[in-house]
Amino acid sequence: MTACTFFGHRDCPSSIKEKLYEEIEQLISHHGVDIFYIGTQGSFDRMTYAVLEDLRKRYLHIKIYRVLAYLPKPGDNDTADTIVPEGIENAYPRYAIVHRNNWMIDHSDYVIAYVTRTFGGAYQAVERAKKKGKIIIQTR
């Protein structure tokens, strides 16, 4: 099993959707990627999740997991495709997203990113993924 995760700025433009679609489909059809981990913050995550759901109609074997940065509250729509990383309950709220991002990097082979600035959480996550030897694909 080969996995991919995603990092991007909260305020990404919808114009990257086609590139995102192409890159994900390329990973599925040419590189055997069948597991996708995605966060739950911002427009990049929402757009990526929508693209993955659309691709799952054609590639029935792929698995899509939403990885939470915070423990779900009672009454949250807890679905089978949700992962809570081990140790997240001990992470300070300020660092919970970093903890979640590190988990996604550690469990992935590829990273698809939309990063246009040299600061912020998405930038830091991509830099960490590079240091860990992950294959980075930029969508800009």
Across the structure, where does each feature detected by a protein language model lie?
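Acidic/glycine-enriched connector segments
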Residues: 1-140
